[in-house]
Amino acid sequence: MSAQTSKSARRALVTGGSGDLGGAICLALGAAGFEVIVHANGNLAKAQGVAQQIIDAGGQAQAVAFDVVDAEASAAGIAALLEAGPVHAVVNNAGIHDDAPMAGMSAQQWHRVIDVSLHGFFNVTQPLLLPMARARWGRVVSVSSVAAVIGNRGQTNYAAAKSALHGATKSLAREMGSRGITANVVAPGVIEGAMIGQAFPPEAIKQLVPAARAGKPEEVAALVAFLCSDAAGYINGQVIGVNGGMG
């Protein structure tokens, strides 16, 4: 599914683009003029719905589905996208929770969360880098979490996976900065979404977040879209929180 593609349009891939936050990021990038590739791990129909919203607003979009943990599936999916030219921006938003205190956490819980957030980051980003370098322009934005900055009970796996992205991103910024490529991390706090009510009741949010409210997906998406813009070309290797003052 796609709209007519302008020859000058930059292309942006958003992994996990069919969820609440991912969808908001896709819409923001579409409004910023990118041709948006909305990725889903499995729910292609939902990704197509996000793509259609972008098209209905006058933008350009398509939907794709592959498992970011599967190296071969990711390589095939990325190769197919690169047949149409470089992907100029990638937003690594795919991630999962599988919470438990570490003393009671299974090896499967540990590995699965790290596989999606960390190995998925490599599987998707690595094959995009040389085409970006040849284009002399690129943006890599990875979505982390405040848990990676200050920690959170029951999330040693999630915090480990996301904080690993911080180090990888800072190193990548040094490797690719001379090629016009920036790499940054956005670390949201408590953000509104389908599951927020169960995990964080309103009174808990007021106690936990200095801003006394949950953030909106659009507030995170606005920062991601800015980091993908020309105006953010000198911001590189940074971890930027969007968390209402949590840390």
Locate the predicted segments by residue.
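Conserved glycine-rich Rossmann-like NAD(P)H-binding loop of the short-chain dehydrogenase/reductase
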Residues: 34-48
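Substrate-binding pocket helix/loop in short-chain dehydrogenase/reductase
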Residues: 101-102, 109-114, 205
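C-terminal substrate-recognition "lid" of short-chain dehydrogenase/reductases
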Residues: 129, 137, 216-242
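Short, small/polar-rich loop/turn modules that mediate ligand/substrate recognition or access, typified
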Residues: 177, 182, 235-237
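Conserved glycine-rich cofactor-binding loop
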Residues: 18-19
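Residue(s) in the substrate-gating loop at a strand-loop-helix junction
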Residues: 145
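Active-site helix of classical SDR
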Residues: 125, 161, 169
